[in-house]
Curated annotation (Swiss-Prot):
It comes from the Bacteria. Keywords: Cytoplasm, DNA recombination. The gene is rdgC. May be involved in recombination. Transmembrane segments: none annotated. This is Recombination-associated protein RdgC. GO terms for molecular function: double-stranded DNA binding. One of its GO terms (cellular component) is cytoplasm. It comes from Hamiltonella defensa subsp. Acyrthosiphon pisum (strain 5AT). It holds the Pfam family RdgC. Belongs to the RdgC family.
Length: 302
């Protein structure tokens, strides 16, 4: 099972399809197919669980797991440029004249599609976890662009998809700054020694610190001068470590050994059982973490 490492979180505005067989049909219409010789990119669904190759969604306890698979042919610009220059030189020598701008553009397209079948492929998986109980959608994606690509595929598959990022009355960076300034973190959270602080001024600076006591006088001075905390390393319930960003994304999520050991009694050879147990454990713990975090942001006083 893939333990999520980077979380992009969204709120579902409308419930998803409850009929699992209907969901499977919709996903099957957009199942992953490898790139053809003249295709640069292909995106589609693959089975989340290798041992269940006929199922494009994994569902348990009203939690759904999907896996978007992307193949992208990689053609370095330098390779295209080198081949294009060679072709231009060859044609100009044959025709004893300089090629026009439009002719060069047309030739560039020809070179691109001639090289494409020989290009190597880069593959990328983006995991989507849908919590139908709390109407949340969590993507294991390191960037907004990657998350949006997977959401676009899901929207295309379902016909519609109404999701929005979580929002709060106060900016996240304001709350993170107050946590440090007041030495008053929400219950369950412990401050670690890594953060990023940015000035609110247009030409202001950025401070990135590691192995730094965030309650030190040095950090206090940065906050007093107007800098806001935009990234903050935290530990939750002695089980999960993470970096919380001002856009509410969670980076470098690490499930500590004390948490993973809860499923250590399961025989690793029982792949399906291990997958099921790990998914249930991960989704339960992350749900509690997110609820704890969202509650802290929502209750923040004026």
């Amino acid at each position: 099972m893939i333990w999520f490492k980077n979380l992009m979180m969204y709120q579902l505005q409308c419930p998803l399809e409850k009929d699992s067989s209907e969901l499977e049909k919709k996903l099957a219409n957009f199942a992953f197919i490898p790139c053809g010789p003249q295709e640069k990119v292909r995106v589609g669904w693959i089975p989340p669980m290798v041992s269940h190759k006929d199922t494009l969604s994994y569902q348990v306890n009203r939690q759904i797991l999907l896996c978007a698979h992307k193949e992208e042919k990689m053609l370095p610009a330098s390779v295209i440029k080198q081949e294009l220059e060679s072709q231009i030189e060859k044609l100009e020598a044959q025709q004893k004249r300089k090629l026009k701008k439009t002719e060069k553009a047309s030739l560039k397209d020809h070179v691109f599609y001639d090289l494409l079948p020989r290009a190597f492929s880069r593959f990328q998986k983006t995991w989507i976890w849908i919590d139908t109980i709390h109407q949340m959608m969590i993507l294991d994606a390191s960037s907004t662009k990657r998350a949006e690509e997977a959401l676009a595929l899901l929207r295309q598959s379902l016909g519609s998809l109404a999701v929005v990022p979580f929002t709060f009355k106060h900016p996240v960076e304001f709350i993170l700054t107050e946590w440090i300034r007041s030495d008053n973190l929400p219950s369950g959270f412990v401050l670690m020694e890594e953060a990023e602080l940015k000035s609110t001024l247009t030409e202001g600076g950025t401070i990135r610190c590691k192995n730094q006591n965030l309650y030190s006088d040095e950090i206090a001075l940065h906050i007093k001068s107007g800098k806001k905390v935009t990234r903050l390393a935290l530990e939750w319930q002695e089980s999960i470590q993470l970096i919380l960003n001002q856009d509410l994304s969670l980076k470098r999520v690490k499930f500590l050994e004390v948490l993973r050991e809860k499923n250590s009694h399961i025989n690793k050879k029982e792949v399906a059982q291990c997958f099921d147990a790990d998914f249930v454990l991960m989704t339960y713990e992350l749900t509690e973490l997110i609820k704890n975090m969202m509650s802290a942001f929502s209750r923040y006083p004026e």
